């Protein structure tokens, strides 16, 4: 992770202005995403990451900027808490992994295969556990160490992308059903782009 080269300067890595712009897409059918995943012998997460790569590719084409030939790296929070473990205390338990999205690949099936291969490689690695331990260690030290660690990590990625599994049953607030909950993933360091996916 520390030996990974810094991300190249692209339209995704411009200096931050201090202002946020938000946008969201119409919801996708999770059932259809799962059908695609089964047909391609992958996971729903692979399908969604492939779609994110396609969206970033279209963004590069729309801005007229050359699409990076080696893909775009995104920082992805990787859950380290067992899914069936009861949650006794509030808080997150995740490590960050760097995922390369093949934005240069125009064939969607080939793009999917590359995403799938990248994700399978990460699942076999200890990158998430290492970053979790390092960030925990730096978080206990002086602020300057934590800021330097976050700065180093943020130089390795062009965006943050997270896929949060939501509740499997409808959620109600004061008797009103929540139809389309959404959230925005926080960014740190010099990362200005956040891609948030929520299953509900």
Regions found by a protein language model. Name each.
Residues 1-191, 197-200:
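Soluble acyl-CoA-dependent acyltransferase catalytic core bearing the H(X)4D motif
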């Amino acid at each position: 992770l520390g030996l990974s080269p810094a991300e190249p300067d692209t339209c995704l890595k411009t200096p931050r202005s201090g202002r946020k712009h938000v946008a969201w897409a119409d919801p996708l059918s999770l059932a259809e995403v799962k059908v695609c995943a089964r047909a391609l012998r992958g996971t729903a997460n692979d399908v969604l990451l492939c779609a994110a790569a396609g969206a970033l590719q279209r963004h590069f084409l729309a801005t007229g900027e050359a699409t990076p030939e080696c893909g775009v790296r995104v920082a992805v929070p990787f859950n380290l808490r067992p899914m069936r473990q009861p949650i006794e205390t509030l808080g997150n338990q995740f490590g960050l992994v760097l995922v390369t999205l093949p934005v240069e690949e125009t064939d969607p099936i080939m793009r999917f295969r590359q995403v799938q291969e990248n994700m399978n490689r990460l699942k076999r690695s200890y990158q998430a556990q290492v970053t979790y331990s390092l960030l925990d260690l730096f978080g206990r030290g002086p602020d300057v160490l934590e800021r330097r660690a976050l700065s180093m990590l943020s130089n390795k990625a062009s965006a943050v992308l997270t896929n949060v599994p939501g509740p499997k049953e409808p959620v109600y607030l004061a008797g009103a059903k929540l139809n389309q909950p959404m959230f925005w993933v926080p960014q740190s360091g010099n990362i200005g782009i956040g891609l948030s996916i929520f299953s509900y």
